[in-house]
Amino acid sequence: MKCICSIYKSPRRREMYLYVAKKDALSRVPEGLLAAFGTPQHAFDLVLMPERRLAREDIHKVLENLEKQGYHLQMPPPEEEYVEHLPDELLRMNDPV
């Protein structure tokens, strides 16, 4: 299955994206989801195919959701992925001897 997809970003949550079939636009997205998502901001369009790889989503799940429910919601990564981890030697620099 090949799908031309429009991807929208949420103004409310960083790294939250809504995938929809371009031909349907936002018509199949439930009103409650749109209210929680905020006014969708178009990020880009993309041709999705089963052999294509996505950075943080399973392409097969995205295509399945687009076909069955008309949209796919990509949630932000867990908070701990936002934190930069410092090496132990830097964390111990101010420890008393």
Curated annotation (Swiss-Prot):
Q: Tell me one Pfam family matched here.
A: YcgL
Coiled coil residues, start to end: none
Membrane-spanning ranges = none
Q: What InterPro entries would the database entry show?
A: YcgL-like_sf (IPR038068), YcgL_dom (IPR027354)
* Annotated ranges, domain YcgL: 3-87
PANTHER family found in the cross-reference section: PROTEIN YCGL
Q: Which HAMAP family match?
A: UPF0745 (MF_01866)
Specify the protein name: YcgL domain-containing protein Avin_32960
Q: Which source organism? A: Azotobacter vinelandii (strain DJ / ATCC BAA-1303)
